[in-house]
């Protein structure tokens, strides 16, 4: 009988853990008494008239009513615990949402302060900061071409018009390449065919020899300018 009564008593350990207090013994006794009366078939609802007129019957009716009220209190307590859990869950969601909103707003403000405008501007700025290889190549070719264009005419101007006498310094500047200049002279002489270019050191030319004709002089000047331009182009490309 006692095992049946204990098994029918509701388990209030979850409620005790959530509330933090132990269930009163009076409430447990009332629940046990209600179960005992239910099993014996003598449970009376509130408001039911008692057939007995003695004092014992009245005390029993009061105990049954008290147990019924305590059972209602337990149900109300369980509903309050459930409501409290729902309120805690809603408050947690609101706090998390507020934290995320403040974090996002701080990130957005930092992004605006860094970019000085819209967020898309930072992406465009990062793409614009990447080096453009095609533009660099075009600039390099233009700079090389402009350098060669400025070097070749200046050398032609320094050498003077065809037929004019040249100094030993100008001739030494043209043949400063040494063996490379000789090779270029031989190749160009072979291509021209009709031009017989004979390379001579500056010392031999100054010591004496037959004067060259103006046509040969002008052809040599043109060839030397072309060779010097090719040499400058090779040097710049190597750099």
Curated annotation (Swiss-Prot):
Give residue ranges of the LRR repeats.
55-83, 93-114
* Xref: InterPro entries: LURA1/LRA25, LURAP1
Q: Does the keyword Ribonucleoprotein apply?
A: no
**Phosphoserine: residues bearing it:** 118, 126, 129, 213
Q: Which UniProt keywords apply?
A: Cytoplasm, Leucine-rich repeat, Phosphoprotein, Repeat
Physiological role:
Acts as an activator of the canonical NF-kappa-B pathway and drive the production of pro-inflammatory cytokines. Promotes the antigen (Ag)-presenting and priming function of dendritic cells via the canonical NF-kappa-B pathway. In concert with MYO18A and CDC42BPA/CDC42BPB, is involved in modulating lamellar actomyosin retrograde flow that is crucial to cell protrusion and migration. Activates CDC42BPA/CDC42BPB and targets it to actomyosin through its interaction with MYO18A, leading to MYL9/MLC2 phosphorylation and MYH9/MYH10-dependent actomyosin assembly in the lamella.
Q: What is this protein called?
A: Leucine rich adaptor protein 1
By which gene is this protein encoded? LURAP1
């Amino acid at each position: 009988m006692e095992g049946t009564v204990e098994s029918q008593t509701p388990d209030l350990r979850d409620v005790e853990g959530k509330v933090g207090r132990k269930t009163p013994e009076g409430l447990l006794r009332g629940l046990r008494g209600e179960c005992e009366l239910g099993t014996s078939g003598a449970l009376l609802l509130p408001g039911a008239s008692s057939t007995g007129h003695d004092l014992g019957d009245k005390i029993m009716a009061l105990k049954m009513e008290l147990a019924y009220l305590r059972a209602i209190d337990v149900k109300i307590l369980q509903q309050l615990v459930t409501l409290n859990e729902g309120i805690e869950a809603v408050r947690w969601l609101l706090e998390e949402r507020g934290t995320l909103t403040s974090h996002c707003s701080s990130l957005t403000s930092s992004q605006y302060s860094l970019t000085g405008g819209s967020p898309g501007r930072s992406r465009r700025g990062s793409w614009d900061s990447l080096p453009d290889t095609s533009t660099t190549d075009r600039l390099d070719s233009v700079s090389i071409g402009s350098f060669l264009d400025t070097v070749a005419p200046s050398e032609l101007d320094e050498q003077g018009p065809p037929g004019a006498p040249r100094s030993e310094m100008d001739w030494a500047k043209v043949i400063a390449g040494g063996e490379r200049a000789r090779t270029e002279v031989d190749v160009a002489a072979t291509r021209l065919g009709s031009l017989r270019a004979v390379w001579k050191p500056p010392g031999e030319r100054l010591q004496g020899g037959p004067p060259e004709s103006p046509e040969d002089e002008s052809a040599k000047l043109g060839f030397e300018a072309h060779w010097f331009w090719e040499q400058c182009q090779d040097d710049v490309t190597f750099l």
